[in-house]
């Protein structure tokens, strides 16, 4: 009977669906595994990146389900976002219609691959019920002070007409559409992620050895903790008159280099710079250049060439009394420290580059024989008055103490991470549940009025915010004073939705109507045991999700500190050496692979072609090879004895049979390590192939039966349809359980030993593993007789199970 993938796969998908085979059990006393792959945006079609992500997760979910765990393996759709509005403009279709049509199609595609997702817990973040509880979280965070409003410079995408978080600006461009990003002052809502900066940093320790080091490092750098000295510098008299300011605050992490200051660098937004601008004390050329810098995103300003302009004013060094020139510089950010930095060119690369460019003084204050800039935090101080000859660390502490004693400075901790701006000027997003009242100011919606949903009678033109232009939607009554008011017309950044979906999945779906999160079930299921997704989310989704977990914990919704226990970041799928994209013409459609070869072939290729964390190069020949392997497995199974296993006696097997059985059990042993720890599915598949090849050389019916019992068990999470089909036919699926190793299989009957004479290998021989040391030495001498002739043996050494060494003279 030939292998017919389509018939087999449709048959088993129907059986699994009808029997709700993949739904988590209600028994919360069972050991659990929560396996989650990052959910997709419903763009219309799944791509090979999705297939890889979900195949990895599905293999793990199926494995743990098979060995007796209660498994939660859900899927949903991150369904709010700008592409739906872009599609509405392009295709003259409502964003909601476009989104839910795509969801319906993608669901069909996902289940055609045999993914064992829970259907009962499937959700879309644009569902009104999801929006309701998201808005509840927003209000609770607002009431706790974790969300606030402010007017600030924001990253503005002119094309999408919306605000972007710092993390959403890539090389000065919008991460979604690629348009240049400008700075624009706007009011908006901010999530106080900085309130958790210390905990977010500290808890990275808990994730070591469970998350990729690269992700941990990226988050650590993004949070950017620095400890240092914040101090005041008085301006000289003339500068006071010009700026209408008497002093400025400066932050430094290198108090030990304070005598090396040769200029102060200010952010363009600093009040001293703004005072000079407002009084027209800077020439037009400088004014234009400062405005150009202000239009750059923070990331652009720090990555572009260093630029600055002397402001014609001076500060007084607090210890030496020297005059220090003040410059405006593009690499200084207004919201880091005080927006003013003391520059020490001799001991900082950035300051050195700037000073060299503008011919500013370079004052060395740490002794070194190396070329400047010398940036190490070690060495003896020089040219630093009473702190000369002190080590850097000791000097830093003493200088900070002196500033504190004089009451002109203090020890402070700064973080690079900024609060998260979540206001977006677009239609297809969750409405921010706030009201603007002329009498009461900003007031939260009443919880009983949630969800605040979107009006459907809107015109999506791509210009401005459709909610702002709607004739009636904004109108409401203030819940506080009863007067006429207006709803907030901004919607939430879509990262807000993806920051808690994992907890919603963990909540029993029978409680979804009544509450955001069911305490009992989220306590059981959370944290996610294994999370799978791309490394591109390291400082976006993953950081926001960690914050949300902690915030919801403190609001009483959750109990765990971290959302994801283990993280796997899978590599990209490439074709012709490049990431698959329509523009490159190198896209492989999963539907075409399924139609031609079947879902199991697609799954097998994806897991065999490369380790999960590495990039995977698409190879048509390798897909063909995966298909041939499944056909071979299917054909070989037709000759396997059906029914109960016949007990095998190891001692009754010949050499070839023992070797084949060993290969089968080695594959089983490897499966434990792969499914539990390394996820190196490619090595596991290779081990199964090797076992089948060894088995082909044997003619033992009972051995072949046992081998298929085990191999189908091992491969079921990877190629489930064909393994279910064959296991049902051969064993009534009784092999789908936790299997045990048989230690006697690993015991070797013979030893292969090397014989060395005076350390030089001369021979190899095979001998019974039960042979005594005396027998082994005698056999070794017999096999090396020609080298021993006429010589006397001084010493005989036997390294058990490995070699014999004879020392002669």
Swiss-Prot record:
Location relative to the cell: Cytoplasm
Name the UniProt record assigns to this protein: Leucine--tRNA ligase
Pfam family, one: tRNA-synt_1g
Motif ('HIGH' region): 40-50
EC number(s) stated in the UniProt entry for this protein: 6.1.1.4
GO molecular function terms listed in the Swiss-Prot or TrEMBL record: aminoacyl-tRNA deacylase activity; ATP binding; leucine-tRNA ligase activity
Family indicated by similarity: Belongs to the class-I aminoacyl-tRNA synthetase family.
Keyword Aminoacyl-tRNA synthetase in annotation: yes
Motif ('KMSKS' region): 579-583
UniProt keyword list: Aminoacyl-tRNA synthetase, ATP-binding, Cytoplasm, Ligase, Nucleotide-binding, Protein biosynthesis
UniProt enzyme class: ligase
HAMAP family: Leu_tRNA_synth_B
One GO term of the biological process aspect: leucyl-tRNA aminoacylation
Swiss-Prot/TrEMBL catalytic activity: tRNA(Leu) + L-leucine + ATP = L-leucyl-tRNA(Leu) + AMP + diphosphate
Cellular compartments per GO CC: cytosol
Binding site for ATP: 582
Protein source organism: Campylobacter jejuni subsp. jejuni serotype O:23/36 (strain 81-176)
Gene behind the chain: leuS
């Amino acid at each position: 009977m030939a292998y017919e993938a389509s018939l087999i796969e449709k048959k088993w998908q129907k059986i699994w669906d009808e029997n709700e085979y993949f739904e988590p059990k209600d028994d919360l006393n069972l050991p659990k595994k929560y396996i989650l792959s990052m959910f997709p945006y419903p763009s219309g079609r799944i791509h090979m990146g999705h297939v890889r992500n979900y195949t990895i997760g599905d293999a793990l979910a199926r494995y743990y389900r098979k060995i007796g765990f209660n498994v939660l393996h859900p899927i949903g759709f991150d369904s709010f976002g700008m592409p739906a509005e872009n599609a509405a403009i392009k295709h003259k279709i409502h964003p909601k219609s476009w989104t839910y049509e795509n969801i319906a199609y993608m669901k069909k595609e996902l289940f055609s691959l045999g993914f064992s997702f829970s259907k009962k817990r499937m959700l879309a973040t644009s569902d009104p019920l999801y929006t309701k509880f998201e808005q509840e979280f927003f209000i609770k965070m607002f009431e706790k002070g974790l969300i606030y409003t402010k007017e600030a410079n924001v990253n503005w995408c002119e094309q999408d007409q919306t605000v972007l978080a710092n993390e959403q600006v890539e090389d000065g461009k919008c991460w979604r559409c690629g348009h240049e990003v400008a700075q624009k002052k706007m009011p908006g809502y901010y999530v106080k992620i900085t309130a958790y900066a210390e905990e977010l940093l500290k808890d990275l320790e808990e994730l070591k050895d469970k998350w990729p080091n690269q992700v941990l490092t990226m988050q650590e750098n993004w949070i950017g903790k620095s400890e240092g000295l914040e101090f005041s510098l008085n301006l000289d008299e003339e500068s006071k008159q010009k700026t209408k300011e008497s002093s400025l605050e400066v932050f430094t992490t290198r108090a030990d280099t304070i005598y090396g200051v040769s200029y102060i660098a200010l952010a363009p937004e600093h009040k001293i710079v703004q005072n000079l601008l407002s009084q027209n004390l800077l020439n037009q050329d400088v004014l234009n250049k400062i405005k150009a810098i202000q239009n750059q995103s923070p990331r652009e300003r720090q990555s572009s060439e260093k630029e600055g302009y002397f402001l014609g004013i001076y500060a007084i060094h607090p210890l030496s009394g020297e005059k220090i020139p003040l410059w405006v510089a593009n690499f200084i950010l207004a919201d880091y420290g005080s927006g003013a930095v003391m520059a020490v060119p001799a001991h900082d690369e950035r300051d050195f580059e700037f000073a060299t460019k503008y011919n500013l003084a370079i004052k060395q204050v740490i002794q070194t024989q190396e070329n400047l800039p010398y940036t190490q935090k070690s060495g003896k101080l020089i040219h630093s008055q009473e702190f000369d000859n002190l080590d850097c660390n000791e000097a830093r502490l003493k200088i900070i103490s002196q500033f504190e004693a004089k009451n002109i400075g203090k020890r402070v901790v700064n973080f690079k991470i900024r609060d998260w701006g979540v206001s977006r000027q677009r239609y297809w997003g969750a409405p921010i549940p706030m009201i603007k009242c002329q009498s009461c100011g900003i007031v939260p919606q009443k919880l009983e009025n949630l969800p605040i949903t979107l009006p459907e009678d809107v015109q999506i033109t791509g210009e401005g915010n459709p909610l702002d232009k709607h004739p009636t939607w904004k109108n409401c009554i203030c819940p506080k004073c009863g007067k006429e008011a207006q709803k907030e017309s901004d919607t939430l950044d879509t990262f807000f939705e993806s920051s808690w979906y994992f907890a919603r999945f963990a909540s029993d779906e029978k409680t979804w109507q009544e509450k955001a999160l069911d305490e009992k079930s989220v306590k059981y299921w959370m944290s996610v045991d294994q999370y799978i997704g791309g490394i591109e989310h390291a400082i976006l989704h993953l950081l926001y999700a960690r914050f949300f977990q902690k915030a919801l914990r403190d609001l009483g919704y959750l109990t765990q500190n971290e959302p994801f226990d283990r993280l796997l970041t899978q590599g990209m799928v490439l074709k012709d050496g490049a990431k698959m994209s329509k523009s490159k013409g190198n896209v492989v459609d999963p539907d075409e692979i399924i139609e031609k070869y079947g879902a199991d072939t697609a799954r097998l290729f994806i897991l065999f072609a490369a380790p999960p964390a590495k990039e995977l190069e698409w190879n048509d020949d390798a897909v063909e090879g995966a298909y041939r392997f499944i056909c071979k497995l299917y054909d070989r199974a037709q000759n396997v004895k059906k029914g109960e296993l016949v007990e095998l006696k190891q001692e009754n097997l010949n050499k070839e049979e023992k070797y084949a059985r060993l290969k089968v059990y080695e594959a089983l042993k490897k499966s434990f390590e792969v499914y539990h720890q390394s996820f190196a599915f490619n090595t596991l598949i290779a081990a199964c192939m090797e076992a089948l090849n060894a088995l082909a050389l044997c003619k033992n019916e009972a051995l072949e039966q046992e081998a298929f019992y085990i191999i189908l068990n091992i491969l079921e999470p990877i190629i489930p349809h064909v393994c279910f089909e064959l296991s049902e036919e051969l064993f009534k699926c009784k092999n789908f359980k936790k299997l045990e190793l048989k230690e006697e299989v690993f015991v070797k009957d013979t030893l292969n030993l090397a014989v060395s004479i005076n350390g030089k290998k001369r021979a190899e021989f095979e001998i019974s593993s039960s042979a005594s040391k005396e027998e082994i030495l005698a056999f070794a001498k017999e096999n090396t007789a020609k080298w021993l002739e006429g010589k006397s043996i001084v010493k005989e050494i036997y390294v058990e199970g490995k070699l014999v060494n004879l020392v002669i003279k």
